[in-house]
């Protein structure tokens, strides 16, 4: 088996995460994902017997894992500084994509499958959001907040960032994101 074929499953999952971020859940077909991944269509179903839902659930998990790593890196220091770094990375992603790329985890969370398929991608999104909340809660707790306050702030931060990304994509303008980012950093720094 060539190296190109042996890494086909990873390329398929990565391509699916990109499609989720750009086009959403229902527009991400297995055929188009395989094409973008330059993977054989037939072998895609061999590697992913659960079909589209399995591919998209794994893509959602992969996207979440990448953000886990970014959060871990950003949140090594003080929470306000770490949040600023994380927001700067998201800001760059929005601008670099000309506002065409959003969060694949949010896409998996908010779209219902158009068929009666299981909602594996939504469940994967819920697990990812829970991990992000836990990371942020821990960082905010290290900064002296009570567990309850830290958890509430973590939920608000995630929801605010996701909403700001959606608003900036809709308006093709970084303004909504920048305003939300400034408020979040100010709120987290306010002790």
Residue ranges and their predicted role:
Residues 104-107, 147-167, 179, 183-186:
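Hydrophobic alpha-helical segments that form the core
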Residues 11, 19-58:
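Helix-turn-helix
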Residues 1-7:
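N-terminal intrinsically disordered/low-complexity leader segments
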Residues 71-101, 153-157:
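Hydrophobic alpha-helical connector segments
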Residues 60-66:
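Short, basic, alpha-helical segments at the C-terminal edge of helix-turn-helix-like DNA-binding modules
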Residues 115-118, 129-154, 190-191:
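Hydrophobic alpha-helical bundle segments that form small-molecule/ligand-binding pockets
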Residues 96, 111-114, 138, 158-175, ...:
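Amphipathic C-terminal alpha-helical segment
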Residues 74, 92-95, 104-116, 140:
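Helix-loop "lid/cap" segments that line or gate small-molecule binding pockets
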């Amino acid at each position: 088996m060539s190296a190109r074929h042996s890494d086909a499953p990873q390329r398929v999952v990565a391509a699916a995460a990109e499609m989720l971020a750009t086009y959403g859940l229902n527009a991400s077909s297995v055929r188009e994902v395989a094409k973008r991944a330059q993977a054989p269509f037939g072998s895609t179903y061999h590697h992913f017997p659960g079909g589209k839902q399995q591919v998209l659930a794994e893509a959602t998990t992969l996207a979440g894992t990448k953000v886990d790593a970014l959060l871990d890196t950003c949140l090594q220091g003080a929470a306000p500084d770490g949040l600023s770094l994380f927001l700067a990375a998201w800001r760059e992603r929005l601008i670099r994509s000309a506002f065409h790329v959003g969060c694949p985890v949010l896409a998996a969370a908010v779209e219902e499958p158009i068929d009666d398929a299981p909602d594996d991608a939504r469940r994967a999104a819920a697990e990812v959001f829970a991990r992000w909340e836990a990371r942020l809660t821990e960082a905010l707790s290290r900064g002296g907040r009570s567990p309850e306050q830290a958890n509430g702030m973590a939920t608000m931060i995630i929801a605010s960032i996701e909403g700001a990304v959606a608003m900036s994509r809709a308006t093709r303008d970084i303004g909504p994101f920048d305003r939300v980012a400034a408020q979040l950093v100010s709120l987290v720094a306010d002790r």
